[in-house]
Amino acid sequence: MTLWQAFILSLIQGITEFLPISSSGHLVITRELLHWQDAGVAFDAFTGLGTLTAVLFYYRKDVCSILYHWFRQFRHCDAPPAPEAKLGNQLIVATLPALLIGFMVKDHIDALTHRPLLIASTTMIFAIFLAAADFWGRKKLSLPETNYRQAFYYGLAQTLALVPGVSRSGITLTAGLAMHFSRESAARFSFLQSIPISAAAGGYGLWKLATNPSDFSWQLIALSYVTATLAAYVCIALFIRFLNTVGMMPHVIYRLLLGAYLFFVFM
């Protein structure tokens, strides 16, 4: 992989990771269209850690507060958990389904990553679901009103993102809006929910890299990490800023057009 290819792919990863348009789908399609080889374990691990860094930094106050109160609840077992501790518990509940199912079916999912027509189909189908949830959802619930059943539903939704083209942020936003959460609350839970699963995926990638060393350039890795981090942070900030005024329809329209284009190219 050249530095130019690493820059393009990590930029795509950063831009698409937190937008409801599927980062994995865009990476696969870019490689297919440009006939680039798979970037490899090192690239995947460090770009994933880059987007993780971005969301951690953007929500650093929330993350610190959640961690503080989550550990504190064990010293005060006789008192009800603080809202931040409860949110931490809910994020664990929302992470477990994708973590467990992903571990069991990873090899099968990897086999789907080179099927452009599948990506085209999921891109379009789940765009329609996102549009329906945004249109009919009542958008009245706030994040503190989340219960454990709803957190579990967020987790089940996240498991669907194992399929290329679905979009992790897209399907969890769809779930939140369908459960009548406000756009801001659904986005905040979705982005916070990405932290544990991204950390697990990054850790797994680093473990694979450590146990199966391969040739890679630290210059390439550094470029990929920094590019993904900066691009992801800017996208999170812009997405949250314009969420209520822009809504989901631009993303829905983009996904429908992208899916149609992929069918045209790969049919």
From Swiss-Prot:
<feature type="transmembrane region" description="Helical">
    <location>
        <begin position="85"/>
        <end position="105"/>
    </location>
</feature>
<keyword id="KW-0573">Peptidoglycan synthesis</keyword>
<comment type="similarity">
    <text>Belongs to the UppP family.</text>
</comment>
<dbReference type="GO" id="GO:0008360">
    <property type="term" value="P:regulation of cell shape"/>
</dbReference>
<feature type="transmembrane region" description="Helical">
    <location>
        <begin position="189"/>
        <end position="209"/>
    </location>
</feature>
<keyword id="KW-0961">Cell wall biogenesis/degradation</keyword>
<feature type="transmembrane region" description="Helical">
    <location>
        <begin position="1"/>
        <end position="21"/>
    </location>
</feature>
<dbReference type="GO" id="GO:0050380">
    <property type="term" value="F:undecaprenyl-diphosphatase activity"/>
</dbReference>
<keyword id="KW-1003">Cell membrane</keyword>
<dbReference type="GO" id="GO:0009252">
    <property type="term" value="P:peptidoglycan biosynthetic process"/>
</dbReference>
<dbReference type="InterPro" id="IPR003824">
    <property type="entry name" value="UppP"/>
</dbReference>
<keyword id="KW-0133">Cell shape</keyword>
<dbReference type="GO" id="GO:0071555">
    <property type="term" value="P:cell wall organization"/>
</dbReference>
<feature type="transmembrane region" description="Helical">
    <location>
        <begin position="39"/>
        <end position="59"/>
    </location>
</feature>
<keyword id="KW-0812">Transmembrane</keyword>
<keyword id="KW-0378">Hydrolase</keyword>
<keyword id="KW-1133">Transmembrane helix</keyword>
<feature type="transmembrane region" description="Helical">
    <location>
        <begin position="220"/>
        <end position="240"/>
    </location>
</feature>
<dbReference type="GO" id="GO:0005886">
    <property type="term" value="C:plasma membrane"/>
</dbReference>
<feature type="transmembrane region" description="Helical">
    <location>
        <begin position="117"/>
        <end position="137"/>
    </location>
</feature>
<feature type="transmembrane region" description="Helical">
    <location>
        <begin position="246"/>
        <end position="266"/>
    </location>
</feature>
<protein>
    <recommendedName>
        <fullName>Undecaprenyl-diphosphatase</fullName>
        <ecNumber>3.6.1.27</ecNumber>
    </recommendedName>
</protein>
<keyword id="KW-0472">Membrane</keyword>
<keyword id="KW-0997">Cell inner membrane</keyword>
<dbReference type="GO" id="GO:0046677">
    <property type="term" value="P:response to antibiotic"/>
</dbReference>
<dbReference type="Pfam" id="PF02673">
    <property type="entry name" value="BacA"/>
</dbReference>
<comment type="function">
    <text>Catalyzes the dephosphorylation of undecaprenyl diphosphate (UPP). Confers resistance to bacitracin.</text>
</comment>
<keyword id="KW-0046">Antibiotic resistance</keyword>
